[in-house]
């Protein structure tokens, strides 16, 4: 096997009580870009996504449709798997919480927490949101004008009283605060970290971790009338897929603990409070980082079925093409903040950055090479200061992208790449290679060489975001098949003079809105 460094990244597992929407697609695209980046950078990556199929909400949705929860889970989980294929996600596994491997790990982690003395039986009475699968304190709820009591996410809550097992979360307050203090990067971005620290400082109550009022879930060991609270089961998926609890020497055990869990900001509490507490109790290693992205807004409004503005990712991809959609969401939205998008915004971004930017640069420079340099990469003369500065900008991109991607700041990595595209445009325009053709053909060759070399490096670095388009872009500059990972960046992989090129075909066509 490989001696590469393991890197384990996950999305949240999606709740399949409905069809996948653009919010699910956004998280999967972003996590896929991060996974691909690390693979190209020489890491041994394991990338996990999947579906979270238990809980009261699934049971209620299935009943409303007149089918069993199993049928609903199978049908909708398949739709999430299909979405992954549509988006060209490179996940190494797709986990379903209804799988036997997951039931086994969930029972194992429960028993480890019980062995630590952290689980006891009592009765629960309190406010519960079926939609959030979450319990809320009285002061987190409010009765609105319609007479209904709502939780902090704006979902209705109901009063629940039943026998329940509890986890001694109250005993983990100081341990969690110490974790956040000693590992400032455990939670990102900073707003979420501050939110969690303030929540934990305000005091933690023991957590109800089983239910008896429904049966669609994983049975509690030795007490089958109880099913596990869906979040005990759901969070455990991340460790299930590695087999770490069952066999520390198993083929995937090396991936635990996870390098980063990518999640939505609405589920930060489960991942940054409950999950590390469960793992501490089970005496298992903690993930290194939990990073919460924001919500996608449609023209500034939150998407909801009632507003009728929920976007199906398949429609967006059919309309604009896959890679342009992937690129838009990674470039336009600051990862970690809420972001707004519109079809006009996508069109503008495609045309500015892709068609007029990298596409135009590649097409102009490579067409000139094919036409004026016998259809092959020219041999450059001595590099002047402009050439050296241009190459240095391209050569320096990997370090910048590594740093930004390491902090999940995908939008900043892309902004840095596009800044170099703009710089190359200015370089190309100011050097006027078309005018040099008659006056100084060797200098023309040098300018074209430098430009093509920057296009090559841009093509390699954009692969995590637009894999299919960048494959075509790298074909245009005849980058060898084994010279497309990050070891080929910089001087190590410079274009070889004399390499034959074919006339470039457009990789990023302009988007023209269809006639109404």
Curated annotation (Swiss-Prot):
Monomer. The keyword Ribosomal protein does not apply. The lineage of its organism: Bacteria, Pseudomonadati, Pseudomonadota, Alphaproteobacteria, Hyphomicrobiales. The gene is metG. Keywords: Aminoacyl-tRNA synthetase, ATP-binding, Cytoplasm, Ligase, Nucleotide-binding, Protein biosynthesis. Transmembrane segments: none annotated. It is an enzyme of class 6 (ligase). It is found in: Cytoplasm. This is Methionine--tRNA ligase. It catalyses: tRNA(Met) + L-methionine + ATP = L-methionyl-tRNA(Met) + AMP + diphosphate. Its EC number is 6.1.1.10. It comes from Agrobacterium fabrum (strain C58 / ATCC 33970) (Agrobacterium tumefaciens (strain C58)).
């Amino acid at each position: 096997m490989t001696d590469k460094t393991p890197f384990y990244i996950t999305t949240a597992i999606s709740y399949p009580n409905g069809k996948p929407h653009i919010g699910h697609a956004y998280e999967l695209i972003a996590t896929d870009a991060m996974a691909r980046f690390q693979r190209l950078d020489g890491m041994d990556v394991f990338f996990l996504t999947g579906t979270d199929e238990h809980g009261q909400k699934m049971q209620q949705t299935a009943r409303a449709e007149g089918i069993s929860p199993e049928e609903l889970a199978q049908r909708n989980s398949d739709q999430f798997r299909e979405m992954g294929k549509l988006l060209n996600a490179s996940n190494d596994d797709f986990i379903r919480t209804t799988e036997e491997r997951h039931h086994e790990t969930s029972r194992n982690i429960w028993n480890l927490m019980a062995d630590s003395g952290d689980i006891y039986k009592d009765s629960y009475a309190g406010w519960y949101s079926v939609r959030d699968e979450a319990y809320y304190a009285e002061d987190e709820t409010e009765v609105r004008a319609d007479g209904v009591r709502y939780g902090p996410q704006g979902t209705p809550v109901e009063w629940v009283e039943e026998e329940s097992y509890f986890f001694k979360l109250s005993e983990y307050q100081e341990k969690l605060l110490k974790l956040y203090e000693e590992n400032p990067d455990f939670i990102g971005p900073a707003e979420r970290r501050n939110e969690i620290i303030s929540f934990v400082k305000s005091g933690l109550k023991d957590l109800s971790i089983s239910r008896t009022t429904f049966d669609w879930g994983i049975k509690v060991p030795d007490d089958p009338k109880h099913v596990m609270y869906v979040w005990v089961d759901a969070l455990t998926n991340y460790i299930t897929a590695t087999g770490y609890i069952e066999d520390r020497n198993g083929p995937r055990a090396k991936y635990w603990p996870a390098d980063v869990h990518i999640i939505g900001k609405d589920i930060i509490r489960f991942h940054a409070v409950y999950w590390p507490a469960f793992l501490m109790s089970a005496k298992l290693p903690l993930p290194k980082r939990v990073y919460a992205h924001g919500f996608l807004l449609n023209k500034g409004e939150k998407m909801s079925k009632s507003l009728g503005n929920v976007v199906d990712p398949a429609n967006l991809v059919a309309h604009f093409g896959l890679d342009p959609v992937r690129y838009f969401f990674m470039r336009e939205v600051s990862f970690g903040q809420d972001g707004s998008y519109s079809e006009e915004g996508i069109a503008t971004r495609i045309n500015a950055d892709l068609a007029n930017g990298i596409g135009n640069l590649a097409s102009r420079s490579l067409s000139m090479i094919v036409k004026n340099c016998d259809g092959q990469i020219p041999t450059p003369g001595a590099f002047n200061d402009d050439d050296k500065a241009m190459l240095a900008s391209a050569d320096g991109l990997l370090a910048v992208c590594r740093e930004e991607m390491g902090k999940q700041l995908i939008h900043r990595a892309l902004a840095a790449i596009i800044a170099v595209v703009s710089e190359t445009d200015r370089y190309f325009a100011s050097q006027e290679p078309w005018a040099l053709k008659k006056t100084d053909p060797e200098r023309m060759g040098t300018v074209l060489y430098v430009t093509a070399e920057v296009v090559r490096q841009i093509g390699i670095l954009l692969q995590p975001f637009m894999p299919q388009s960048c494959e075509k872009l790298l074909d245009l500059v005849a980058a060898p098949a084994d010279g497309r990972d990050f070891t080929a960046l910089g001087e190590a992989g410079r274009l070889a003079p004399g390499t034959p090129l074919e006339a470039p075909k457009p990789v990023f066509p302009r988007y023209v809105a269809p006639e109404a």
